[in-house]
């Protein structure tokens, strides 16, 4: 989701929400709970004793069912740890800044820990040719605003995930094109 957090005649700054979305918290929690259940039942089948009273493993033979449940439980817990770390590190969060004073466009995002944790891409505002809007309807709809930049590939500005409504896409693209004084392509 893009929030227009700073608006003036000379600087436009849009905040971009990263991985700290409600849906990510939901899926990380569901995967952790489900994987924990699988792992507990798998271990219970090995021990021939119910570790948790409401998760009975009396009818489950350890080889192959309990072993497979342990494997899926372990894999699910690893996936859940990855999801929780992504949320903790807030991967994908950042901003798009369009600065007429200095003549710069700055696209900033937080990445995974390491030497490239801070993703900071800067372009000259004069290199922006247009704002391109891509709209694909169907089973997997896609609605993205791109910054068309001279000499490089188009830079996506909208978030990944739940697509924005047509009205929101049009309003954001129009506001950005008006600010940058460039054309809109694709609408």
Swiss-Prot record:
**Keyword Transmembrane helix (UniProt):** yes
Q: What InterPro entries does UniProt report for this protein, alphabetically?
A: PSI_Ycf4_assembly
- Give one Pfam family, short name only: Ycf4
| Coiled-coil residue windows | none
GO BP terms, alphabetized: photosynthesis
Give the transmembrane region(s): 25-47, 62-84
Keyword list (alphabetical) reads:
Chloroplast, Membrane, Photosynthesis, Plastid, Thylakoid, Transmembrane, Transmembrane helix
Q: Where in the cell is it found?
A: Plastid, Chloroplast thylakoid membrane
Classify the protein's membrane topology as the record does.
Multi-pass membrane protein
Q: Using the record, list the residue span of the signal peptide; answer none if the entry has no such feature.
A: none
Q: Does the keyword Lipid metabolism apply?
A: no
Query: How is this protein annotated for GO cellular component?
Result: chloroplast thylakoid membrane; photosystem I
This chain's function reads: Seems to be required for the assembly of the photosystem I complex.
Q: Which family does it belong to?
A: Belongs to the Ycf4 family.
Name assigned to this protein = Photosystem I assembly protein Ycf4
- Naturally occurring in which organism (per UniProt): Mesostigma viride (Green alga)
Which gene name does the record give?
A: ycf4
